[in-house]
């Protein structure tokens, strides 16, 4: 179960149901992904060796070989779909609460000096050019001063994307 900290967006029943569905689908796909090893060992690698008389010379060759495999194609398409579903399900939560979230963050930051941002640092072009994790505007976009909606969207979605594997606060990563 996901935990809610002080600036986590409030959710309604249907939103939680959508999140739970996507989290469980991602959990299932984590098991399905294990078949990619078999697809590589049984089909992609032998086919490549038969055609080229050698093993892979680069990760690009390996990627091209795997992209031809039906199991990998199915897993990849489903994984992409869950990312799109996650964005559709999650974006409305922080956006309908954007002003309230901004106020909560401002109140916390007012009494804490734990985060100091440098206004002179600009987002690099390579980050501006891409919507990371399919999130429109990525992590850096502000619709108004102090906007934290995209950060809140990412925060809530991380639990769903990882199917809770990072813990209830998404802070349990272990190498």
Segments (PLM) and residue ranges:
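Conserved SAM-binding loop and adjacent beta-strand
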Residues: 143-153, 158-175
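N-terminal auxiliary segments of SAM/dcSAM-dependent transferases
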Residues: 2-148
């Amino acid at each position: 179960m996901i935990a809610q900290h002080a600036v986590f967006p409030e959710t309604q029943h249907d939103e939680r149901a959508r999140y739970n569905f996507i989290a469980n689908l991602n959990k299932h796909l984590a098991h399905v992904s294990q078949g990619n090893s078999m697809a590589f060992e049984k089909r992609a690698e032998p086919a490549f060796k038969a055609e080229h008389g050698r093993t892979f010379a680069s990760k690009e060759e390996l990627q091209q070989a795997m992209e031809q495999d039906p199991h990998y194609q199915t897993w990849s398409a489903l994984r992409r779909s869950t990312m799109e579903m996650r964005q559709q399900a999650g974006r409305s939560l922080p956006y309908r609460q954007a002003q309230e979230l901004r106020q909560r963050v401002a109140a916390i930051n007012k009494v804490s000096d734990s985060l100091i941002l440098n206004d002179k640092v600009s987002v690099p072009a390579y980050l501006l050019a891409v919507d990371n994790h399919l999130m429109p505007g990525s992590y850096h976009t502000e619709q108004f001063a102090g906007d934290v909606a995209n950060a809140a969207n990412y925060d809530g979605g991380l639990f769903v994307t990882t199917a809770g594997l990072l813990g209830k606060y998404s802070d349990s990563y272990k190498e």
